[in-house]
Amino acid sequence: MYFNIIEAVYSDKFRIDLKFRNGKSGIADLEKYISDGEIFTDIRSIDNFKKFSVEFGTLTWNNGEIDIAPETLYEKTTGEKIVFENIVKKTG
């Protein structure tokens, strides 16, 4: 997919440097995002947060039990709002 992550490197605190399939890259600050929702409880400690991997084009933790949609990560990294109509036109 257009927004799949192809590379992820831990930066600091709750920040990860991401590179996307479409060539865009940047740092996603996920501290506020993971502070809500019971699903993220396990990765609210820095030690657990650092244990991410890239699977199926997105970030996952705990062997895939926790993930964040690549579109969400793209928006948080680039600041660009995704409009799916434009994606269909680009990818045809």
Q: What are these regions, as identified by a protein language model?
A:
Residues M1-G92:
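Motif-centric detector for short Cys/His coordination patterns
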